[in-house]
């Protein structure tokens, strides 16, 4: 019965997803021996760094290639016009670039099922007057050419004929957001998810008017001769939706960035410049098989990198260790930065090793940090509670929902270890994830800057502009 219903849904989606009205071009059959995915650079789309590849679209593309049982080839482009042209010419099989569904795209391409939703927001800088209306702007709007933002402005212009804007072809959304923060332009339009991610590094960004709400982010397929690929994509999407993959990736890339503290973010960026250099070598030395930046992020959350930090509850030092924990791991002086960092790393590593093997490697750190905060026993209580509620005890996205319940008598009276401040643990882990993301960004920026200084400026690549800061150069489109 389930298969029958899915077949009906699949057929409906294939025929009703959209009607594409484009000119027929000569079609050269392409046997799918690899999945060629056209994309753009961006932290939520596709990035490459020393830690490997990442991005919501990239992670989904990896899974789709595995589903099709073919190798994946990511092909990044520098602008949307080239990307669209490549798809129409059959140089790529699909576009996965964080693009929203729009009428113009629906007319030109076939649109895949929704991955997540975003709002389109007007972005301005801290200190500027808050716009009350699109006509109440004290400056000019700058947007990316061929973007969905141009479509939005074009529609708004019909109601507000005096509305004007600039379009750029040699910048991406990340660069425009940086230009807002650096006072180089007045306004831009961006997806809400992009603003949430980038304000961790650019805290002066502000979201103003919501111009479009709840837009689906989708993949684009060729307008013709793509029935088979669309059918496979829909079946894959259905499978991953049921498996919770979309929820997992949504939490992975966006779940921890929704909270934002302007003052804290600015203070953290200052601390990276002024305080971290004194202790970075200690974090790198004692991290061992851990990412030193996760260790440093944990330390900042604990003590703001203050080796003399103390709390009324008796925890002390850079890693805010309790006396029993320090004794257990052989630390004699908790106020010594070197000992505290060494002890914190050892304790965190022990938390990771104690976790059940059923917890995926990519999520073990978040479970371990929750254990570091409220204790391993309470995390195990939460996992058992999740299981009883038919949630996944091995998925951080589900544990985040359950941990706050440990503060409610209805739930904690059924657990072995009782009450715990579970909501505090969720906030604790989310904060560390934000600090970690910022450290990775700053570290990559520094490496890119050092690399640029080492290379002669007249040896520019003929392939076009370099990747965004913090990325390595994967295959360029031929």
From Swiss-Prot:
Gene Ontology annotations of biological process type: cell wall macromolecule catabolic process; cell wall organization; peptidoglycan catabolic process
Residues in the signal sequence: 1-22
Domain remark from Swiss-Prot or TrEMBL: The N-terminal domain does not have lytic activity and probably modulates enzymatic activity. The C-terminal domain is the catalytic active domain.
Region LT domain, residue ranges: 258-478
Function: Murein-degrading enzyme that degrades murein glycan strands and insoluble, high-molecular weight murein sacculi, with the concomitant formation of a 1,6-anhydromuramoyl product. Lytic transglycosylases (LTs) play an integral role in the metabolism of the peptidoglycan (PG) sacculus. Their lytic action creates space within the PG sacculus to allow for its expansion as well as for the insertion of various structures such as secretion systems and flagella.
InterPro entries: Lysozyme-like_dom_sf, MltF, Solute-binding_3/MltF_N, Transglycosylase_SLT_dom_1
Any one annotated GO CC term: cell outer membrane
Keywords: Cell outer membrane, Cell wall biogenesis/degradation, Lyase, Membrane, Signal
Underlying gene: mltF
Active site: 302
CDD domains listed in its UniProt record: MLTF-like, PBP2_YfhD_N
UniProt family annotation: In the N-terminal section; belongs to the bacterial solute-binding protein 3 family.
Record's protein name: Membrane-bound lytic murein transglycosylase F
Disulphide-bridged cysteine pairs: none
Enzyme class: lyase
Catalytic activity: Exolytic cleavage of the (1->4)-beta-glycosidic linkage between N-acetylmuramic acid (MurNAc) and N-acetylglucosamine (GlcNAc) residues in peptidoglycan, from either the reducing or the non-reducing ends of the peptidoglycan chains, with concomitant formation of a 1,6-anhydrobond in the MurNAc residue
Segments of this protein annotated with the region Non-LT domain: 23-257
GO molecular function: peptidoglycan lytic transglycosylase activity
Membrane topology recorded in Swiss-Prot or TrEMBL: Peripheral membrane protein
Biased composition (Acidic residues): 451-461
A matching Pfam family: SBP_bac_3
Start and end residues of each stretch annotated as Disordered: 446-478
